[in-house]
Amino acid sequence: MKKKIKIITDFDNTLSTVDLMDKLMVKILGERGEEIVSDWESMKIGAVFAHKQIAKNQKLTNELIREAAKEVGIEKGIHELLGYCRENDIALIVVSDGFDVYIDDVLSRNNLSDLPVYCNETVLINGRMEIRHPFGSNECDFCGHCKDKTLD
């Protein structure tokens, strides 16, 4: 049996025109957010730690995340790529360490909501935002989403 070809894409700064996670860190946490982004990008800290820092801030809400997402577009050529994939029975899949609420929002606004998405989840519990990592690894908590495991 022939295996189906899959194209896997990240979301932040790959499918989208900016890294919305970085923008949220800075918008919500200010200078501390800039430090976290810098430490994250230099791999001094992992996504799980960064997510915990943003989630413990009272300002984080789905509405704030959606508001920030309004400024985000998608890269040129994505619709053409999706058309090519559909014509040739190739799966285009989004695998991200970002949050469902902004990924879903940006994809929906750009008529891409039918793409399969594997990402972290934001949930409101007792009035506080919690970030869940359904695709994390039990062996490592550096990344919120262990993309290697998702690709298996």
Please give the residue ranges for each predicted region.
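Generic cytosolic/nucleocytoplasmic N-terminal low-complexity/intrinsically disordered segments
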Residues: 1-2, 146
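Alpha-helical substrate-recognition element adjacent to the catalytic core
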Residues: 2-121, 125-126
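Conserved acidic, metal-coordinating active-site core of Asp-based
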Residues: 110, 115, 119-152
